[in-house]
């Protein structure tokens, strides 16, 4: 699967998942998805948010707990065979947890933008994802899911 094909596949699968859960993930519909489906959705949120505004945007938009503190990093590392990427997400999660209250607080646009300097490590993690992981991991995620999904 080429990179472009994997992006199309990822978006198609996750669009269907989002439709199935009624448009937005919530506590009341979490059990409608399998663990592998949650991994696909978590990766979609991660990829979309980090490509647009880094991990700071991902966290500010409310995806931090689901993507970084949920089972997604551990599943990648232990079951999906993506040890290095899973560990990378654990490193991001450690930085997130250390600054969680400040990162999740409501902010003006100006204060939000200032976080990119204030939390330089998270900003660098976003660059690292884009430079070192995104083009390699996206096809691996799509291929793993396609090969292991329930038929």
PLM feature segments, named:
Residues 1-56, 60-69, 79-151:
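Extended, alpha-helix-rich binding/interface surfaces that flank or overlap catalytic cores
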Residues 72-74:
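Non-transmembrane, aqueous-exposed alpha-helical and coiled segments at domain scale
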């Amino acid at each position: 699967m080429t990179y472009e094909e994997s992006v199309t596949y990822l978006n198609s699968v996750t669009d269907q998942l989002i439709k199935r859960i009624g448009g937005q993930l919530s506590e009341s519909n979490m059990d409608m998805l399998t663990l592998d489906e949650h991994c696909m959705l978590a990766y979609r949120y991660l990829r979309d948010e980090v490509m647009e505004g880094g991990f700071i945007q991902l966290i500010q938009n409310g995806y931090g707990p689901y993507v970084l503190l949920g089972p997604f990093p551990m599943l990648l590392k232990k079951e999906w065979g993506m040890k290095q990427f899973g560990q990378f997400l654990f490193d991001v999660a450690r930085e997130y947890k250390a600054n969680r209250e400040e990162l999740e607080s409501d902010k003006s646009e100006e204060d939000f933008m200032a976080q990119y300097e204030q939390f330089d490590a998270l900003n660098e993690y976003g660059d690292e994802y884009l430079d070192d992981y995104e083009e390699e991991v996206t096809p691996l995620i799509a291929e793993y899911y396609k090969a292991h999904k329930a038929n």
